[in-house]
Swiss-Prot record:
The keyword Ribosomal protein applies. Belongs to the bacterial ribosomal protein bL20 family. This is Large ribosomal subunit protein bL20. PROSITE patterns: RIBOSOMAL_L20. GO terms for molecular function: rRNA binding; structural constituent of ribosome. GO terms for cellular component: ribonucleoprotein complex; ribosome. CDD domains: Ribosomal_L20. Keywords: Ribonucleoprotein, Ribosomal protein, RNA-binding, rRNA-binding. It holds the Pfam family Ribosomal_L20. GO terms for biological process: ribosomal large subunit assembly; translation. It comes from Akkermansia muciniphila (strain ATCC BAA-835 / DSM 22959 / JCM 33894 / BCRC 81048 / CCUG 64013 / CIP 107961 / Muc). The keyword Nucleotidyltransferase does not apply. It comes from the Bacteria. Binds directly to 23S ribosomal RNA and is necessary for the in vitro assembly process of the 50S ribosomal subunit. It is not involved in the protein synthesizing functions of that subunit.
Length: 127
């Protein structure tokens, strides 16, 4: 009786890994033994970078807001303080988008934040 090696299932499993390794360089896309390691490592990078992406976008939004606010004569932290004082609850994603795409709307928000800071500072000086 011939030896059963579960051939069709093994071939399917190897083919699936090799298809996922398509585009990798050299033997990492040709040989199952190395393609498997490369695909598993790629999955680790994918998982890690899905988590990192959130922080990277937050840093990008902060940089864009900071650049727009500095052009208008405030720092990022003072601007955020002004937004809080003016009870403006816009997140950084929306603020960054406004700073890049709709400067008039951003100017209105900036003016409100600056006014709130001045009112807050004036109240602190009077106290």
């Amino acid at each position: 009786m011939p030896r059963a090696t579960n051939g069709p299932a093994s071939r399917k499993r190897r083919k699936r890994i090799l298809l996922r390794a398509k585009g990798f360089r050299g033997f990492r896309s040709k040989l199952f033994r190395y393609a498997k390691d490369a695909v598993y490592k790629a999955w680790q990078y994918e998982y890690r970078d899905r988590k990192r992406r959130k922080g990277q976008f937050r840093r990008l939004w902060i940089a864009r807001i900071s650049a727009a606010v500095r052009d208008r004569g405030l720092t990022y932290s003072r601007f955020m303080e002004g937004l809080k004082a003016a009870n403006i609850d816009l997140d950084r994603k929306v603020l960054a988008d406004l700073a890049v795409s709709d400067e008039k709307a951003f100017d209105v928000i900036f003016a409100q934040a600056k006014k709130a800071i001045e009112a807050k500072d004036g109240a602190a000086l009077r106290a």
